[in-house]
Amino acid sequence: MTELHEPVAFRTALQDWLDQTDLTPPEDHSLEAHMTQFRRVQRALYDADFGRYGWPERAGGLGGPAVLRAIVGEEIVGRRLAEPGPYSMLEVLAPTMIDYAHPELAAEMVPKLLRGDEQWCQGFSEPGSGSDLASITTRATQHPTEGDRYIINGQKVWTSFAQFSQRCILLTRTGDADTPDHQAITAFFVDVDTPGITVRPLRTMHDVDEFCEVYFDDVEVDARRMLGKPGAGWRLAMDLLPYERSTCFWQRIAYLYARFDALIEEVKRQGQAVDSDLGEVYLALHTLRCRSAATQRKLAEGHRLGPETSIDKVLLANAEQLLYDTARNLLPGVIELENSEWRTEYLYSRAATIYGGTAEVQRNIIARRLLNLGKG
């Protein structure tokens, strides 16, 4: 164990390096510019080794607890050097590849993601299958004459950053009509430039096209790109979703704190009348951070994350929406009348109770799997 495996020493070394390294983002605030800046930051972190700590050596990392990755995200996003969105794919998909891909494939591919050489996306949701993943219809069938290949047909939607991605972790339906849903899902690691794949960005109400529709028309994939065994896709998804609802939010929390500080600066001249409003936001953010710290400790102790991460997701959504609701109330007209950063972020925050699993689904998980309240 090296000195930098200790979180306090690691954070100090990272802060010193960031103070001496110019990673200032460009003035261009387009999504494409944000993605380019993220790759630039990732390459710099990887080359300086900070982006390799917290990841296992067998996948190009330098070992150490996962909390080191949280520290990197907090420092980078807290300084507004990169946006939190792309980090979500890194924190969700890299652990999945490490756990489920053939070791040789993980050793080849994961460093490309850590270095910023590639962006990956997650092909789970479909037009008729969002929170109910067991009902997906995108199908993978074995090639009729080449048994070591699969042919994929179907459609995915709400696929974040697919237009910038080189690879996709894709859930498909396999088996026959008699195969139970949870045993009929198989995951593949697919190259997005494979013939038959079409990516179409979707423009959302906050005027950013980070989500996409992805179509698969007779897409051929090598069986060696299967993640796990046939029918193991449901288990993969259940292992992945807790990371989607916890670790990938580390950077989001840092970003929300930075925006909270900005809100304080904008309203501090309004006097004591706003203190209670800001206090409620601080309490929500502080509660979220404490909960996230507990999740980080579980990871550091080697525990697998499970349904308890639904609590993290509920707290994040509540804190994010409260922050931007408070900004709307304390900055009259800024969100409604001005084309400002606050407006874009307020609109995006409306989806906080939807993306990554709806608030209703999260509360059902908490009720049934943590509190054992049953389905009544």
Model-predicted regions and their roles:
Residues 116-124, 170-171:
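A short, Trp-centered hydrophobic/proline-enriched beta-strand micro-motif
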Residues 26-32, 268-275, 286-340:
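C-terminal helix-coil-helix/basic helical segment that borders enzyme active sites and/or dimer interfaces
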Residues 1-86, 108, 112, 271-279, ...:
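Amphipathic, small/basic residue-rich leader segments at the start of a protein or domain
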